[in-house]
């Protein structure tokens, strides 16, 4: 999971407001003639060396993010497991076409070119110079040298004219600081003693489940996938699996994503493609969403493409950063909206919680907790299933002796992301939003094997032996693969995974409801029982919490047990 995560200093956390300035919408008018309204995209003050203003002629790709409609109805439909078609979701919940056209027209008047509206009308994307973007969004963009790289970021909150304040909630693309490139923990010498996909399936009660041939899974990746697909074919042969259909879906022109991309051939993509498809024995298809860079805007647009295409049932994202960054730049809001639509369509997204234990993943994680407390985005997304890490003590067949919380597994409570209502009986901290209007989302929701000392075997080439690798980058595709088996057994009608998991927990361990100053307050069962479909992990620590019976910030509800989970659902 981890890698070179970027860090910010002195984030501007002021809530959106209005600057009282008179004026109209004419692009010829000066910025001071508008009455500007702040969006959710706030100022970023980067910790690197500030180099001054970014070249005014530099070209940027910018997305204006529009709000969903009828948001108060979404969770009720999810809790009813009502699955809608993409057409129904767009008709009831997506922004109106007229709103998207209004935003598109504004950007065109401001000089934006190559404008497009996403299939769900959530994003209006176009190209502009820095000068045009600064004028259109009343902001300022500076350049920095950060960790040896030249990057840019907006140092002033992005705003829109008051007449567009109800159409634009955030702006993506005003910064390009990359999310950390995943760096899997591998053995210093070749190690073939790790778990095979068959052993992992056995460890998590999936061996006797039917192959997930009705379910399409997806992963997020970057670069030329030629070697990744070749390695998948080699792994299928060596591990004795049938070949699965693979589709590479580019979030933009292929040449711009593939050519000279330093992420081409990353071992992360081999892990994701091999374990998401082999743990469930087979899948209907594997979709690889290939994004140009690992910046927040690219990843957010990739998530939205997964939803707006509505081809895959499940998505795994082995990536992350300190969640306050995504909160500030608008990526958190964007993916929450996109994945809300996905949840209505019956799609689920899984994301690894990081390899820095209780700490914010600001630096290359080593599996040893260090730094200030914090959690990782996108694993803490409102509709995401965050997957933590375990140490899996089992024999080569996957017969389990014990499963412990892994010290590097990310976990904790977000001060930025709100907790979904179905999590509150398990996690009382989630109720803090009643007092602060934000925050309380805790991760992980579930967990799976991640410890590099109990690794899984991955083929990173088309010859030789597999490598033993670890990290929560393992846990996310493994868990998605397990849930793919369960979804196939239920004809893909289970709906949002995180709601399914917590509904079982809440049924087994109902909380006591008390009256609080702002409404009902849940008091969790002080002596929770194991939940059918999960292995309750009660030993181990991630440096900030200790695993215990029931829900905890190390391993969530526990690790999936596919056959039992399928029966319980």
Predicted feature locations:
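Secretory targeting and sorting signals
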Residues: 1-31
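Substrate-binding/charge-relay-adjacent region of secreted/lumenal peptidase catalytic domains
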Residues: 32-116, 125, 130-386, 414-471, ...
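Short glycine-enriched loop/turn motifs at secondary-structure junctions
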Residues: 118-120
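Walker A/P-loop NTP-binding active-site region of P-loop NTPases
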Residues: 482
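An often Trp-containing, charged/polar helix-loop segment at the C-terminal end
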Residues: 487-553
């Amino acid at each position: 999971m981890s890698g070179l995560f970027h860090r910010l200093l002195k984030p501007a956390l002021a809530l959106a407001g209005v600057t009282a300035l008179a004026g109209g919408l004419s692009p010829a008018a000066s910025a001071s003639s508008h009455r500007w309204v702040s969006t959710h995209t706030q100022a970023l003050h980067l910790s690197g060396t500030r180099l001054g203003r970014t070249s005014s002629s530099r070209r940027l790709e910018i997305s204006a993010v529009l709000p969903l409609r009828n948001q108060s109805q979404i969770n009720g439909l999810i809790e009813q497991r009502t699955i809608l078609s993409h057409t129904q979701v767009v008709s009831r919940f997506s922004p109106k076409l007229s709103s998207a056209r209004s935003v598109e027209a504004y950007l065109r008047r401001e000089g934006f070119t190559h404008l497009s509206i996403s299939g769900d009308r959530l994003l209006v994307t176009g190209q502009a110079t820095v000068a045009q973007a600064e004028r259109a969004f009343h902001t300022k963009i500076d350049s920095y040298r950060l960790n040896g790289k030249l990057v840019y970021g907006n140092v002033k909150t992005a705003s829109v004219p008051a007449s567009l304040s109800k159409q634009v909630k955030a702006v993506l693309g005003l910064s390009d600081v990359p999310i950390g490139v995943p760096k899997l923990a591998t053995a210093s010498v070749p190690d073939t003693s790790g778990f095979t996909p068959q052993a992992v399936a056995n460890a998590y009660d999936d061996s006797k489940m039917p192959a997930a041939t009705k379910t399409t899974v997806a992963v997020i990746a970057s670069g030329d996938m030629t070697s990744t697909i070749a390695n998948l074919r080699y792994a299928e042969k060596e591990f004795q699996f049938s070949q699965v259909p693979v589709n590479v879906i580019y979030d933009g022109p292929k040449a711009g994503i593939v050519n000279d991309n330093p992420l081409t051939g990353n071992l992360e993509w081999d892990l994701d493609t091999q374990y998401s498809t082999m743990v469930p024995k087979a899948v209907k298809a594997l979709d690889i969403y290939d994004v140009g860079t690992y910046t927040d805007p690219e990843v957010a647009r990739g998530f939205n493409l997964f939803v707006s295409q509505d081809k895959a049932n499940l998505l795994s994202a082995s990536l992350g950063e300190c969640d306050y960054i995504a909160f500030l730049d608008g990526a958190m809001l964007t993916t929450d909206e996109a994945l809300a639509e996905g949840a209505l369509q019956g799609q689920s997204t899984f994301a690894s919680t990081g390899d820095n234990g209780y700490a914010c993943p600001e630096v290359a994680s080593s599996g040893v907790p260090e730094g200030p407390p914090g959690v990782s985005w996108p694993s803490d997304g409102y509709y995401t299933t965050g997957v933590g890490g375990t140490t899996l003590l089992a024999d080569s067949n996957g017969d389990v002796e014990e499963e412990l919380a892994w010290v590097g597994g990310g976990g904790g409570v977000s001060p930025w992301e709100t907790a979904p209502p179905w999590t509150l009986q398990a996690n009382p901290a989630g109720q803090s939003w009643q007092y602060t209007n934000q925050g309380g989302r805790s991760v992980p929701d579930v967990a799976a094997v991640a410890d590099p000392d109990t690794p899984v075997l991955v083929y990173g080439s088309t010859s030789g032996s597999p490598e033993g690798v670890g990290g929560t980058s393992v846990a996310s595709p493994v868990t998605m693969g397990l849930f793919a088996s369960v979804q196939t057994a239920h004809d893909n009608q289970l709906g949002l995974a995180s709601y399914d998991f917590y509904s079982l927990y809440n049924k087994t361990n109902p909380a006591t409801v008390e009256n609080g100053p702002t409404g009902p307050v849940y008091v969790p069962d002080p002596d929770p029982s194991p939940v059918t479909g999960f292995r309750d992990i009660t030993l181990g620590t991630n440096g900030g919490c200790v695993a215990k019976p029931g829900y905890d910030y190390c391993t969530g509800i526990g690790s999936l047990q596919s056959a039992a989970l399928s029966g319980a659902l």
